[in-house]
Design a protein with these regions (language model features):
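N-terminal amphipathic/basic leader segments beginning at the initiator methionine
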Residues: 1-49, 310-329
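Gly-rich Lys/Arg/Thr-decorated short loops/hinges at beta-loop-alpha junctions or inter-strand turns
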Residues: 44-52, 61-74, 135-136, 208-224
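Short, acidic/small-residue loops that bind anionic groups at enzyme active sites
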Residues: 73-78, 121-143, 279-284
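Mixed-charge interfacial surface used for oligomerization/domain docking
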Residues: 163-268
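C-terminal non-catalytic interaction/assembly regions of soluble proteins
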Residues: 238-329
Length: 329
């Protein structure tokens, strides 16, 4: 294993301190328990948006703390859920009279710990559960996983909260975005968790994992490597079958890198995916390409499609000022 590490034990702490210093105009770090929050408090009465999860997916979630998105993020250890104490401390620090909305990816540890924090809070709160991974059917035992679509929920709901939407409206909007968003990923290689020191799974030089999870979970199937067009058609076909978009439907296309795939290849994937849906009459009117929901050093990417209406377009276009997303301000 070759990584820039002093010791595994202090990796997260050093990384978070560096992140907070590098973006000191936007965020601040609470050392114990760990959470990242805005440096400038939100307006009184604003709904506080909080998310979090295991580290190793940067810039998710800390990179999305700031005006127009999250009020705080709770980073756990690598691929490990943050604790209820982190979530409770973050909520108490940023709640400002409008209640708290937790945005939670659908993983058992995250769901359980956010539920505990929710029960401990003494202010109005609600939860949006993100489950955009269509690698498995909705009837899967634990439900679908939350993956790259999470940032789309955070951006759109964050804009509405910034504009003064109340807790019920923010919760309803988050659920709406989740229902019209679908993602699926492919891995060309595994990732290496620092504490483990070796790849999380073995994969042959001529194999790819279709439907891989962002923690290296096994996907839908393992197949022989094939052309980029064939890979995109496979992923986009499953997403299309799930969402069943209508001709002329407006949509956001998000190509997300897992950490070790060059932008040259991510833009190639965007070109192929956009052609897939343009041929079917979809109006790809918004886009996002880059490494936003990563899996440490995994080579691969995911495709996310979100169906849009005028309301969702307005909130997506609204100003945002975070470490990882910034426009209109």
């Amino acid at each position: 294993m070759k990584k820039f590490i002093d010791t595994v034990d202090n990796l997260l702490d050093q990384s978070l301190r560096g992140f907070a210093k590098a973006h000191a105009d936007i965020v601040q770090l609470n050392a114990q328990p760990h959470f990242v929050s805005r440096i400038k408090p939100a307006a009184p009465g604003k709904v506080a948006l909080i998310s979090g999860g295991g580290s190793g997916h940067e810039p998710l979630h800390s990179g999305f703390v700031g005006a127009g998105m999250l009020d705080a993020a709770c980073p756990g250890q690598v691929f490990t859920s943050p604790t209820p104490d982190q979530m409770l401390a973050a909520a108490q620090a940023v709640e400002n009279g409008g209640g708290v909305l937790f945005i939670v990816k659908n993983y058992a540890g995250d769901v359980m710990n956010f539920e505990i924090a929710s029960e401990m809070l003494d202010c109005p709160n609600a939860t949006v559960l993100v489950c955009d991974d269509v690698s498995f059917p909705k009837s899967h035992s634990t439900g679908r996983r939350g993956v790259a679509g999470t940032l789309i929920v955070e951006k759109i709901v964050g804009a509405a909260a910034e504009a003064g939407a109340d807790l019920a409206a923010c919760k309803a909007l988050g659920d709406k975005v989740n229902q019209v968003t679908a993602s699926m990923g492919v891995a060309l290689s595994s990732c290496t968790v620092p504490a483990l020191g070796k790849p999380t799974f073995d994969i042959g030089d001529n194999e790819i994992e279709m439907g891989v999870g962002i923690h290296g979970e096994r996907g839908r199937e393992r197949i022989a490597i094939r052309s980029a067009t064939e890979i995109v058609d496979y992923l986009a076909g499953i997403i299309d079958d799930d969402l069943k978009p209508q001709q002329g439907q407006a949509a956001l296309l998000h190509i997300n890198g897992f950490g070790a795939t060059p932008l040259m290849e991510l833009h190639l994937i965007y070109e192929l995916a956009s052609l897939f849906w343009e041929k079917r009459g979809l109006n790809i009117c918004r886009s996002l390409v880059g490494n936003y929901t990563t899996s440490l050093d995994m080579a691969g990417c995911s495709i996310t499609l979100s169906l849009l209406d005028d309301e969702l377009i307005r909130w997506w276009d609204a100003p945002v000022h975070t470490a990882a997303l910034r426009w209109g301000c």
